[in-house]
């Protein structure tokens, strides 16, 4: 079991739910006039029961004032055009096939259309869904750990987990919300061993078709079990595919079974070539710090894992090899999709997130065994 399910409850208000509820109502009224208060309070009292609720309320205001941009703007424009149609008519609309025919975007647009056709409201609701699923997928599974006293290395890794996820990802609309659905159920599956969570993690496909890759990785991880030579062989092959610039993902997307499911931009050769040229230009002339920061983060977290392995031993690693194996598969899948800038960027960030979660759990498990020298070394590596 990855996490001890016993939560160290230091929240005195949790004994009196009525008091907590009244506090939430009062703070919500205050946030109506000063939304930033909710963010500050949710961060200051992140261990308290009301913190996630305040954070979600703040996300509504954040999305409202941020307004749709990038992918979210495209979906809003499509929503604006079909808002007065029935659910069936929206499903059959040509734009639905073009921008995503998964269950989540279709139902989201339909139910928002029943309330209001307003771009600020559309963005606010998208941000609320994204934030709620982030809490479900990342924050809640780690709650039994961050409720405990944490050492400096644990704090830094916990912050690494939280800040790996960036605020503007809600503009992706479909992908990251679905990714957090998978993360939430899969972490629960690893922790409890319950097969039902593994099945439920497949719900991520209802958000974005590319998340099928996560389901494939989960099943492959289940089948491979402890055959780590195969894991590392897959990783080596993925690097060969990456540096040879083989369009592995787009070639798979050409299969007939994806014809009515994936977006046209993934199957149209002219669009694929244009996107490929754009990706090369971005990687060559784009902001190198932004492009390399996840790579630097991976090397940092792998260095911490190496230190833990050498200084403390491999007991935690042996108990949680399934988690480690999934991290290896995620890195491999990201490499397989390197030619596609969007696919690689998304799945590499997911791999970074899972590696940080794995390392944070490891440090929390053995922090009492860490010497001052080891803590200092991990702290320096994590900061760098």
Q: What is each of the regions a protein language model found here?
A:
Residues 68, 73-76, 82-83, 88, ...:
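Alpha-helical transmembrane segments and terminal signal-anchor/GPI-anchor hydrophobic tails
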Residues 73-80, 92-117:
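Short hydrophobic/aromatic helix or loop-helix immediately within or flanking a transmembrane segment
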Residues 165, 196-220:
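Membrane-interface alpha helices of multi-pass inner-membrane proteins
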Residues 125-145:
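Transmembrane-helix motifs of polytopic, lipid-linked glycan transferases
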Residues 166-182, 207, 304-366:
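Membrane-water interface signatures at transmembrane helix termini and the short loops
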Residues 179-196:
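Membrane-interface transmembrane helices that cradle and orient dolichyl/undecaprenyl
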Residues 48-53, 231, 315-327, 371-379:
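Membrane-interfacial loop-to-transmembrane alpha-helix junctions, especially the N-terminal start
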């Amino acid at each position: 079991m990855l996490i001890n399910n016993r939560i160290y409850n230091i929240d005195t208000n949790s004994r009196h739910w009525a008091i907590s509820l009244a506090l939430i109502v009062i703070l919500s009224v205050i946030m109506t006039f000063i939304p930033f208060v909710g963010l500050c309070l949710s961060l200051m009292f992140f261990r308290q029961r009301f913190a996630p609720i305040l954070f979600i309320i703040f996300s509504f205001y954040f999305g409202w004032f941020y307004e749709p941009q990038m992918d979210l703007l495209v979906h809003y424009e499509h929503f604006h055009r079909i808002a007065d149609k029935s659910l069936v008519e929206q499903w059959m609309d040509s734009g639905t096939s073009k921008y995503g025919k998964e269950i989540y975007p279709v139902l989201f647009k339909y139910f928002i259309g029943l309330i209001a056709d307003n771009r600020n409201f559309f963005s606010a609701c998208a941000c609320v869904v994204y934030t709620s699923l982030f809490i479900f997928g990342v924050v809640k599974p780690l709650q039994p750990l961050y409720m405990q006293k944490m050492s400096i290395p644990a704090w830094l890794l916990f912050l690494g987990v939280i800040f790996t996820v960036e605020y503007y990802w809600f503009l992706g609309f479909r992908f990251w919300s679905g990714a957090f659905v998978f993360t939430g159920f899969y972490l629960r599956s690893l922790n409890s061993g319950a097969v039902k969570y593994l099945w439920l993690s497949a719900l991520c496909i209802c958000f974005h078709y590319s998340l099928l890759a996560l389901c494939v990785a989960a099943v492959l991880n289940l089948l491979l079990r402890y055959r780590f030579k195969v894991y590392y062989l897959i990783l080596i092959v993925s690097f060969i595919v990456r540096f040879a610039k083989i369009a592995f993902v787009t070639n798979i997307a050409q299969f007939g079974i994806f014809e009515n499911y994936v977006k046209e931009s993934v199957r149209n050769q002219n669009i694929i070539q244009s996107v490929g040229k754009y990706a090369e230009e971005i990687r060559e002339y784009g902001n190198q710090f932004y492009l390399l920061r996840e790579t630097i983060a991976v090397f940092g977290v792998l260095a911490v894992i190496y230190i833990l392995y050498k200084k403390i031993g491999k007991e935690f690693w042996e108990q949680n090899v399934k988690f480690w194996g999934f991290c290896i598969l995620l890195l491999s899948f990201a490499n397989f999709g390197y030619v596609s800038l969007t696919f690689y960027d998304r799945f590499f960030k997911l791999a970074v997130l899972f590696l940080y979660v794995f390392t944070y759990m490891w440090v929390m498990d053995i922090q009492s065994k860490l010497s001052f020298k080891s803590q200092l070394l991990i702290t320096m590596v994590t900061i760098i």
